[in-house]
Amino acid sequence: MAPPREQRGVLAQWRFGLKPREEDHCTVDLPVFEDCAEVWRPHGRLRYGKLGGAGFIADDELMMADLKLSEYDFDDFSTTSEEAYRRLTDYARASGYPFVLRVWNYFSRINEGDGDDERYRQFCSGRQRALERDWFDEDPAATVIGRPGQSSRLQVIWLASKRPGRCLDNPRQVTPKRYPREYGINPPRFSRAMYWEGARGELLLISGTASLVGHESVHDGDLAAQVAEIRRNIDSLLIQAGDVRGRSIGYQTGAVFRVY
């Protein structure tokens, strides 16, 4: 782990469509609807540096880190995924922020391949092998986003904490680790949401969700019905978070939703 350097002002800034500044550490190649920015403010002293092959920035409670691997450096995409998550767990433990709350995974050609050779299923298999060696106490909230083009890069961004969160299930949906075999040799490993409290307040980190009921997408071809189903899924997670918190949680000013 490289010695951290101090930074001021911003823990993380997601800049959609805005031209990257020269000093920006992490960029993701995705098309956007319009220019905007999502800014995460720090709590306490900021520092940044390197964790092996990953860059990080952290404050007194949270750390954001970014790892990029090329599948050309490994036997196949499953092995690339396994190595990414092996490093993620090693780096998180070494950093002093061992509790991984949220992960964003980006790679191209996500549905390429037939059956268990599909790239998304290969990604899940590699991730599972890494986590069998070093399980998370709680599976983090997570999203897998397909990027355009033919990139060989697997990019993993994660948010971690010095204190654990509480993983949440959605009773309207099958728990990911119990998905039936038709979704691959290894089911996906994530929680539907993660609830976390700290000195800065509380966070509800919701995984990528869709018009999913049980384990199947519904309302194929009907965008309005799909959006309504997504809203019901988010409402269900807000109820679960309220049960953990001990009082109801609603849509608050400043809540951020990303649409892919």
Question: What label would you give each PLM region?
Answer:
Residues 1-260:
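N-terminal presequence-like segments and the immediate start of the first folded domain
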